[in-house]
Design a protein with these regions (language model features):
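A residue-level marker of the well-folded mature domains of exported/periplasmic proteins
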Residues: 9, 18-154
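Bacterial N-terminal signal peptides
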Residues: 2-14
Length: 154
């Protein structure tokens, strides 16, 4: 999944690379500082930004607090970046800040968590990710078909 997100972000930036030089994008994730999974994403956006001549800033709530994440999205939008990339870790908590960014004319791309329908309802340009419920359900069906009676889906 992380490779898919990195590729999608790279392609998104590459699509407008001629006009992107000097632009600033902010990626806001829900991950606490202790979540090392996001290091792949941090490295990918840094490399994509360097390659395309754009600034890409990674921001997150240090403890994973979603109210803090909402404030980070608001602060990011107030800085008027050329785009915001964000997770939808909790639709109800993040709905307002994301919609305000869109109303300011800031393009938003939703990644990783949430659903395509939620992203659309918030005004995001696109959703790149795998809805957790659908992924878990699909894994359960495959396990059932394979005769597995107990497993842990992470």
């Amino acid at each position: 999944m992380s490779g898919a997100i990195a590729i999608a972000l790279g392609l998104t930036f590459a699509a407008g690379s001629v006009q992107a030089a000097g632009e600033k994008y902010i990626l806001v994730s829900h991950a606490p500082d202790s979540d090392s999974w996001w290091n792949t994403i941090k490295n990918a956006i840094r490399e994509a930004g360097d390659h395309l001549g754009v600034e890409v800033v990674y921001r997150n709530p240090p403890t994973g607090d979603l109210a803090d994440m909402a404030r980070i999205i608001e602060q990011s939008a107030a800085s008027r970046p050329d785009g915001i990339i964000t997770t939808i870790a909790d639709y109800d908590v993040l709905k307002g800040p994301i919609q305000k960014a869109v109303k300011r004319g800031i393009p938003v791309i939703a990644i990783n968590s949430g659903t395509p329908d939620q992203a659309r309802s918030l005004g995001a340009l696109m959703y790149v990710g795998q809805p957790e419920y659908d992924a878990g359900y699909g894994a359960g069906m495959k396990a059932k078909d394979a005769g597995v009676t107990k497993f842990l889906c992470v």
